[in-house]
A protein has these predicted regions:
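Cysteine-cluster motifs in flexible loop/terminal segments that predominantly coordinate metals
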Residues: 128-178
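A conserved active-site cap/scaffold subdomain adjacent to cofactor or substrate pockets
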Residues: 8-76
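Generic alpha-helical secondary structure signal
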Residues: 26-29, 47, 81, 85, ...
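Short, composition-biased local secondary-structure segments
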Residues: 1-2, 118
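Internal helical hairpin/lid segments
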Residues: 51-141
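Solvent-exposed alpha-helices and their adjacent loops that cap or buttress functional pockets
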Residues: 2-12, 30-34, 129-131, 144-145, ...
Length: 178
């Protein structure tokens, strides 16, 4: 969360509402507890995002990191126990490769053994190809907070929401297109 030069790179976290709907708030509490950073669950509408940012700024100004929730119409403290139970029954934690970041241990999910018959990759004998870096794309640095989107040499030129080059621009919710 801090840069190699000791400066803070990430001040706070805008947490994903769709994940918190299932998991609740507890899995995010370590951000405030261990790293001293505010973290707020927000929805996807502009007013939802603004509301989450306002709460986040208040926490930063007061110097009181916590986990907040402004997406109360969908996210509850405990999440969805039923959905979590299904996830835990069908999936196990696995290493995952993330566009722009590479392999992150224990950051993904894989079908448990008894569900492997439903694994299309295994069933069809497919393997994911290693993704090649995109020349000039700085998505990894943007996702880590090292660069802002407009500092990427591709941003707004060859990489736009209509013609995304890297993973940061692949949707209107991406870190560059949002």
């Amino acid at each position: 969360l801090d840069g190699e030069d000791g400066r803070k790179r990430i001040d706070a976290f805008l947490l994903p509402g769709h994940v918190a709907v299932v998991l609740g708030l507890e899995p995010f509490r370590f951000l405030a507890r261990e790293y001293g950073r505010p973290a707020v669950v927000g929805g996807f509408e502009p007013a939802d995002i603004l509301s989450a940012l306002c709460l986040m700024v208040g926490m930063l100004r007061e110097g009181k990191p916590a986990v907040g929730n402004t997406y109360i119409r969908a996210v509850h403290e405990e999440g969805s126990p039923q959905a979590r139970h299904v996830m835990e029954t069908v999936f196990s934690v696995a290493d995952a490769r993330w566009r722009g970041l590479g392999l992150i241990p224990d950051s993904g999910l894989a079908l448990r053994g008894e569900w492997r018959d439903f694994d299309a990759m295994e069933k069809l004998g497919l393997e994911l190809e290693e993704t090649k870096p995109i020349p000039g794309c700085r998505c990894g640095d943007i996702l880590r907070g090292v660069l802002t989107p407009e500092k990427c040499p591709l941003f707004g030129r060859v990489c736009t929401p209509q013609n995304p080059t890297g993973p940061c621009m692949v949707s209107t919710e991406g870190s560059c297109a949002a």
